[in-house]
Every structure is written in structure tokens, then in C-alpha cells.
Amino acid sequence: RHWLAIAARLGLADPDFRDADGRSAYAAFLGLRLTQARLGAAREHDRLDVQTRLSRPGPARHLSVHDLLIGPQRIARVELLSTFVGRLRPGDNRSVARVSVPADTTGDKTGDAADDAADNGQSDGDTGLPPLAQRVRALRAGVDLDAEGLLAPPATLRFSFTPCPRNDFNGAGFLYFANFAAVLDRAAWDWWHEAPQQTTAVREIAWFGNLNVGETLHVGLLGVHRDGPGAGHACELRAGDGRLLARALTRRRPASASAPEPQP
């Protein structure tokens, strides 16, 4: 929905984005934020409706907000922030860099310098940024355990996973963004065998890069919730050579607490 919404905004029939030289460009995610999630409220045969809104908070940036509804009740909100990127070397996900898409910049009176300033924390203040952009900036700087209500883990925990090119990479050749979240859940299950009835209440991910086929993804535990890891935790995801690919925060709730909330 995010990519289709961008395509519709740019007047394209499909999300086939191109840079100034006609090469493929991609709306790659900088951040994801899942909030107000009561996923345990969903039942077999329920009809899930998704309401999507798209905005453009800055040059080359697009923010989509998706409300997930069962009837009149919202069971989750998902926010996605993307920027346009392309590969400097064909087939090499390590060579990804930000690019300009002429269809997006037509009539744009702001410059790329504004994007660079936001990336480097040089804006007029966080009050001018969407909440997801603020969280991406915070996670880029690191994880403040005290501010997040987390404690340093009592032991070093690691989890490794080598994605399969037939299942985990998308048609553009990138490790699919949803599979980063799946690996986080695999790691948590491996470490603690959380109760299956627990569901994710909040998840925030900030991305820094992507993997090539054949590389291994390593998850490291940064912090655990004061009420125990089952209540929440923070992780880093790195490539085998140590490259930082993502930081993530996860908070859980028991399935018994997952009744839907009225939509405001």
C-alpha cells in the first residue's frame, strides 16, 4: 500500500520509480512504527480493513499511516517512512545510496540539503518532525536504555539467521522489510520461548542498510524491559562484517489484554 500510494501521488500506474538517468529507484524504508496494537483481537473469518493516508514530510521522503480495522474497532496502527534509493553497483545491496526521482521533485521548492540536515540531526527542532521521524532519529543515535525503561541484559545473547533468496528477498533483490521483524521474533523465541499467547503491542525499527544474498544476519540483544524480556526488549541487527543494518524496540502484551479499542 505504501508504494502504491506513492505511485498514485506521482501519477504512475505502477510503483516503477526511476532516477534522472532512467535507472530503477526504490522507496526504501527508513523506519517502521507499530502502535496501539491489539493483534490478539483478530479472529478467524474476521474482515480486516486497512485505511491508508500518505504525506510527504520532506524531499524524497514519504510517510504512510495505516489503520487496521475489524469492523469499527482499530486493532493496530502502522507508520512507514521511506526515501528513494538506488544501487550504485548492479545487484549489490551494499552500494545503495539516496537518489532523486524527477517525478517526485517536480515543483519541489526544497533541496536535498534539507534531507541531509534531517539525517544528521540538524533541523529546526523535533516538533517539526512526524513522530516516526523523531523515533528514527533517536534510534540512529543509539538506544537510551533509561529513557526506554530498559535494563542492560544480564548476559550476552546473539541469534544468527541466513536469509533464503527464494523466500526472504523481494522481487527487487532486497531482504524484504517485513523479514527483519520476523527475524526479531525468531530471536526472541530462541532466547526466551515467550508464551505463544503474547502479542506485539509496539514495535519500532530504524533501518541503516540491507543484505546481499548469502550474507548472514546477526541479532544482538541491547536491553530488556524492567518487567522482564517478555514485556519488551531492544536489539541491533548487523551483517557478518559488523555493518549495522537496523535497531529495533519491541514491547509485548498478553493476548488476554488484546481486546480492540474504539476508533477515535
Task: Label each residue range with its predicted role.
Residues R18-A20, A76, F84, A181:
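Bulky hydrophobic/aromatic packing residues
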Residues R1, T35-Q36, G40, L48, ...:
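A generic structural micro-environment signature
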Residues T35, E79-T83, T162, A206, ...:
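Residues in well-ordered beta-strands of folded domains
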Residues E148-R238, G242-L244:
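Acidic/His-leaning functional-site neighborhoods
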